[in-house]
Swiss-Prot record:
Induction cue: Induced in response to decrease in pH and as a function of growth phase.
GO BP annotations, alphabetical order: nickel cation transport; peptide transport
Single annotated GO MF: peptide transmembrane transporter activity
Protein name, UniProt field: Nickel-binding protein NikA
Membrane-protein topology: Lipid-anchor
Organism, as annotated: Staphylococcus aureus (strain NCTC 8325 / PS 47)
Gene deletion effect: Deletion of the gene strongly reduces nickel transport and urease activity. Mutant shows decreased virulence in a mouse model of ascending UTI. Nickel accumulation and urease activity are almost completely abolished in a nixA-nikA double mutant.
Lipid-bearing positions (N-palmitoyl cysteine): 19
Entry keyword Cell membrane: yes
Keyword Ion transport: yes
Gene designation: nikA
Length: 491
């Protein structure tokens, strides 16, 4: 009897261990991202779109063109009206059908909750009936379709019982099941996804600010896929036969952002700092060739941008400019410069700036923070900051100009303001002709550059690394999309 009981227990252990093996060999993917976010509401972060949890009405394809996503057809009968018909076979992850009324509620709630969305969508009214949606704007707004492709305009069910900040319910192939703030997101596949059954069973996303730690987690197989790979680790990953690197010349620009509310950050000071930056050296040595020196906010791969001449490092010119404001070797300018580890190259740039600035009679105090977005809200706490963002995510300059140069723009952290630049941006917003939009864009670049609103340093490549068993993830210039229903891992 005793032996029978032991045999039964042993059999049970085998069954349980077998079940464990089956689970571990399932299609589970572990992803590591930088840049913590306190909320994962779609209007607060692009993470839900990046990881396949939410979708916008439109999307950007691999060539940077806007195409339909949740939309069956659309028509613009005049400059202020957009008629949309939604696809009829799409469900939210809670089983509710995607209807025009659901989209209306989502967009209106996002505009109410987010300044970025509100100022990107100058909408006067939305009417909904069945699968048909009519959006009217306050005035001519030719880039409305492009803005509706913005991941911050992703559609979610406002009637869902869950908290949109914790577990938003979207239409993507993977449903967010649990969110531990600034630490981890757990997702499961949505079997009724409209494009087909997702290839993965589960996805776990963790936030890891330190780029070197992200690489270590990939090498140890703790993670399967990581973004924003530090350039000094690319060669190590390429030398590992179990890993692979994917690169794409990107639309992300690294920059030195100035606090225009601070009296010491005068135009002379901003010009001096602009002359201190060795853009070519930074691109060659800090980015190790995975970036190009910047001459404006926009990557020079954009064909219609007339790139200004590259500003070369000139320490003597910087000293002369600073002398105008009374700064000398005996009385140096003291600046507090903020940086963060989510993009490790930025901290290295800060250190180079600190060293070079000393030659021009500037003492830079570097402070590294965890929550860069939260920290910059207090403008009394900083003079300048390292920063990085996608300046032209959908092929048009309007997004950047409205968000970075308008006074109430969501990424105008330093409160830059020029009424003449504002007038040109307003003109751009109401201009339909594509060639004329390009001309106005170049006029804005030329006029604003006289103010030195920020110092643009480098255009960064998008660098993603993965276990060689991971297939069909996306690496795109704008860095928005990563996971879709075809992404899989071979176990």
């Amino acid at each position: 009897m005793k032996f029978k009981r032991l045999a039964t227990i042993f059999s049970a252990v085998l069954v349980l261990s077998g079940c464990g093996s089956m689970h571990s060999s399932g299609k589970d993917l572990n992803i590591s991202l930088p840049l913590k976010t306190k909320s994962i509401a779609p209007y607060e972060t692009d993470v839900p779109v990046k990881i396949g949890a939410a979708e916008s009405l439109f999307k950007t394809n691999d060539q940077g063109k806007i195409e339909k996503a949740l939309v069956k057809s659309y028509h613009q009968p005049n400059d202020t009206t957009l008629d949309i018909e939604l696809k009829d076979n799409i469900k939210f992850q809670n089983g509710q059908k995607l209807t025009a009324e659901k989209v209306k509620s989502s967009l209106e709630n996002s505009m109410k909750k987010s300044d970025l969305v509100k100022y990107s969508l100058p909408i006067s009214s939305i009417t909904a009936k069945g699968q048909k949606l009519t959006i009217k704007t306050n005035s001519a707004y030719p880039e409305l379709v492009s803005e509706l492709a913005n991941p911050f305009m992703a559609i979610y069910d406002t009637d869902a019982k869950s908290d949109v900040n914790q577990t938003p319910v979207g239409t993507g192939p993977y449903q967010i099941k649990d969110y531990k703030q600034s630490r981890k997101i757990s997702l499961s596949n949505f079997k009724d996804y409209w494009q087909g059954k997702p290839k993965l069973d589960h996805i776990t996303v963790t936030y890891q600010e330190d780029g070197n730690n992200r690489v270590r987690n990939l090498e140890s197989q703790k993670d399967d896929l990581i973004t924003d790979v530090p350039v000094n680790k690319v060669q190590d990953i390429e030398n590992n036969q179990n890993l692979k690197v994917s690169k794409e010349s990107g639309f992300r620009t690294s920059l030195l952002m100035y606090n225009h509310t601070n009296k010491k950050m005068t135009k002379s000071v901003r010009e001096a700092l602009d002359h201190i930056i060795d853009r070519q050296g930074i691109a060659d040595h800090i980015y190790q060739g995975y970036a190009k020196p910047a001459t404006s906010p926009f990557n020079d791969k954009i064909p219609y941008i007339k790139e200004p001449k590259l500003t070369k490092q000139n320490i003597e010119q910087a000293k002369m400019l600073l002398a105008k404001d009374g700064y000398t070797k005996e009385h140096p300018l003291k600046i507090k410069l903020i940086t963060y580890d989510g993009r490790p190259e930025l901290s290295k740039i800060a250190q180079v700036l600190q060293s070079d600035a000393k030659k021009a009679n500037i003492e830079i105090d570097i402070k590294s923070v965890d929550d860069i977005e939260g920290y910059l809200k207090d403008r009394s706490a900083w003079d300048a900051t390292m920063y990085s963002f996608g300046t032209i995510p959908r092929g048009d300059t309007g997004y950047f100009f409205n968000q970075a140069y308008k006074k109430d723009g969501a990424i105008n952290k330093g409160d830059y303001n020029n009424s003449n630049v504002d007038d040109l941006i307003n003109q751009l917003n109401h201009t339909v002709d594509v060639k004329e939009r390009h001309n106005i864009s170049n006029d804005i670049i030329k006029l604003s550059s006289r103010d030195v609103p920020n110092s643009y340093i480098a255009y960064n490549d998008q660098i993603v690394a993965a276990n060689s068993k991971v297939k069909n993830y996306k690496v795109t210039p704008e860095g928005i999309y990563l996971i879709d229903y075809r992404t899989t891992i071979e176990r």
